[in-house]
């Protein structure tokens, strides 16, 4: 546990996140790099030996198993799957009269647009939710993983469902089903000492969603401050996203209820907050770090105040990389005050540094505290111009 008053998870001085959705087998070099540089890792659930290695050599690292909340995939050989309900099990249940596949109005199963062999499941069906929770909890009970990252906690139709479909007149039905699945899975996982960290899509659009869905371990924002290399959230929405996640990231999670004498109690830990921002392929002239990575990292510090767990930057769906930047080793310490707003620029002072980001579309000249140096150890002027969607 870190010594910061925020009690950050992941270990002191480590702020990187390893978000791995598959790809080539993990190498020993990648594992050793992760031990030195990452506060949190999301691995495929069958990568058990990698999880054991990370927990042995970096016990403070949060290591999560990927599980999709909304789909099953027909291409996975097993015996461990990235879904709560394997394709073969779902087919077997359907043949026995318990069909949990989603269907179009004509009766066809729904394969996700852009993701072949991914099939939408009936998240609104209590039966599907029961099988999902039962399967995942049994798998996690004696697992080296700290818990589960629940992917596709969706807010809108991202995969060509083209509503209405059978049993689903609108996205409200799907959202409500996911609300219930997250609550049920989270409570059951917490009961065995594990956490649930959903990939909470567009929480800024529904007041309180981040708080509710992160209540069982934390949350993951996959589109931090933007969707693509040049596709950013407009300034009001970027600020709303940052403040919404910061507000919802506080508080403790109760794990593994136990008995002490005649009293019932549980251990607690802080929530995990993971961010991922899209790479831009534009490099900082000072350190060579991707400009969007720096923008996201500045937001990580400004909005998180030193309490967020880890951040990553990748290309779209490029989740077999080991992203890193020199700036991820900069520990700014604890927040020395709140967020200071200068137009579309958000700044914050820390006990060992300062961070700022411009969420707007125009350049802004910002005032800088005295006695600061940059990454090259050069004195920082009292003011400078922060470009649109730039962070320092």
What are these regions (language model features)?
Residues 1-392:
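Glycan-processing catalytic domains of CAZymes
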